[in-house]
Amino acid sequence: MELKYVANEKDNERTVKSILKNELGISLSMLKRLKHESGPDSGIYVNSQPVYVNYKVKPGDVVLVRMNFDDNCDDIVPENIKIDILYEDEYLIVINKAANMVVHPVAMHQSGTLANAITYHLAQKGINIKVRPVTRLDKDTSGVIVFAKNPYIQNALSVQMSNKSFLKEYIGIVWGTINEDRGTINLPIERKPNSIMLRHISETGKPSITNYEVIKRYEYATLLKFSLETGRTHQIRVHCQAINHPIMGDTLYWKWVYAIDLFIQKYSLCFPDEIERYKITEKQCYENQSLENQCSDEYLFNIYKHVNSMLIQRQALHSYKVRFLHPIKKSELEIIAPLHDDMKKALEILENK
C-alpha cells in the first residue's frame, strides 16, 4: 500500500514525521515500524530516496510511504456463514450484522463469529489477511459494522471516531412513551463491581452521552433514533434503562415499567405457571395495579421475558447508519443497514395493537 504527499510552500523545512502524522494519518506505532525499513515494499521516501523521519522537506518534494502489512489470519478459522455485505473495496468491508452473532472470536465463542465469516469470504478471493473491527456491536444488536483490511485503515477510522467526525446512528424500540421529541442522556457509566459484563450508572464512571430523537410513538412503546457522543460498552442500553425506558427485549438491562402492565391488562395476557408458582391470583395481576408492587423480582423477570418474546426475541436495537471519510479515496461514505425482519415484525405488532 502506498501513500503520497506533495509538499507545498507552507511545508518548507517541515519534518517528514510531522507530515506522516498530521497529513497522512500514520500513527506513532506505525511510524516506529517504518522508521528503519527501506526496500521495494516498505519504507519512507522523498523524491524516491529513502529518508529518516527527521528529514526536512522543501516545496515540491514528493513524500512517499510504502507499507507492507504482512499479517495473515491464521488464528481465525474460515467458516462458510452467510453475510450481508453493504460495501467492500480493497481497504474495508461493511456488513449488516445479524443478531445472535458475536463479532470476533473470544474465549466462549471461538467459531460462528462475523470474523470467521468474513475470513471465509476473503479466502474465496484468494485473500489471506487479518480483518480488524473498526466498530463493534453486542451479540444481539444487529446492523452496520465496519471492518478494516489493514492497520492503517483501522487507525485512520479510529482517529475519525476520536474527533467525532465518524457518525454512527442506531434505531431502537423502548418500552413506554417518550414525550419529548428529542433529548440527551448525560450519565457516567462504569463496569459494575464483581461483574465482567454488566455496566451501570455511577458518579465515578466515564462520561457517557447519548442523544435520541423520536421517530414514532406507539401506545406502549417509542421508536427512537440514537446518536452517540461517546462509545461506552452497552451505552444505549444502560442509558435507556436509567431513564425508565428499557430497550424492548433486553433481558440484561431490563426494568419493569408501567407500559408493560398496560400491555398485559389490555390484552388479558395470562401466565398460569408463574401465578401458581408464586401464589399470585389472576385478579391481582389484572386489577390495574403494577405487578412491580406485588410480585418478586424473579416473577417479574419471567413475565418480562415472556411479554418481550411476544414482540421480539432479542434487544430491539439496530445499528442503522455510518458516515465517514474514506481514508484513501477521500470521499464521504454513508452506508445504511435496513432493519431486520424481527424488528419490522415487532413494529407491525405495535402498529396493529
Map each language-model feature to its residues.
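Short histidine-centered loop motifs in beta-beta connectors
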Residues: 50, 213, 219-227
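Short coil-to-beta-strand transition motifs
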Residues: 76-80, 201-210, 316-317
